Design a protein with these regions (language model features):
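Active-site catalytic pocket residues across diverse enzymes, especially alpha/beta-hydrolases
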Residues: 47, 51, 98, 133, ...
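Conserved phosphotransfer microenvironments
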Residues: 5, 10-18, 22, 26-53, ...
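Two-component/phosphorelay signaling modules centered on CheY-like receiver
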Residues: 1-9, 124-165
Length: 185
């Protein structure tokens, strides 16, 4: 469901990551914590200071221990934390969620695209529900796009699919709702 598959560059050390970021333009950083969760979040903050325009996602294995450690971390350097539950559709959902967040302002206020707001604070739950939600929305959009008369109209209908936004707190949900209340599904 991506117009073109993403290119992925894997690095094994923080030094390699910073070297790559200095050499090439990247649209997304996905980092996976090792044994020391704190180092991951410290490095994410350092990356965010240097590259504030690049979304940073932490992808963790699911365990109660990891969840407890994340609850104590400063998450200011990351845009999202997701729990890897073995569903590869999560990667597409992460990309789509970030695209939707970046495009929401123009697509919703100028074009009139609808918005689905998911309000959830459980990393494990939103990591499992978002791939299902996006699969449903994208399938419905594909069905709708088959009614188009030509390729251009088909692409416009696919791009006009409802946007999905994730709020992890009540305050965040209210802020999004107040901004886009006229376009909520």
């Amino acid at each position: 469901n991506l117009s073109s598959p993403p290119r992925v560059k894997q690095v094994t050390t923080n030094e390699e990551a910073f070297e790559e970021l200095a050499l090439k333009r990247y649209d997304l950083i996905i980092t996976m914590p090792g044994v020391d969760c704190s180092e991951t979040f410290t490095q994410a903050k350092a990356m965010k200071r240097l590259y504030p325009y690049i979304p940073i996602v932490v992808l963790t294995p699911f365990s109660h221990e990891v969840s407890r450690r994340i609850a104590k971390e400063d998450l200011s350097g990351v845009d999202y934390v997701f729990s890897w539950l073995g569903n590869v559709d999560l990667l597409v959902a992460i990309i789509k969620l970030i695209e939707d967040k970046m495009n929401a302002e123009v697509d919703i206020t100028s074009v009139g695209v609808q918005l689905i707001l998911l309000v959830e604070d459980s990393i494990r739950f939103y990591s499992s529900i978002l791939p299902n939600l996006y699969n449903f929305v994208l399938k419905q959009s594909q069905i709708f796009s088959t009614e188009a008369l030509n390729d251009h109209e088909r692409m416009l209908r696919m791009r006009g699919r409802p946007k999905v936004m994730l709020a992890r707190t009540y305050e965040e949900a209210m802020q999004i709702y107040e901004k886009y209340s006229g376009n909520m599904l």
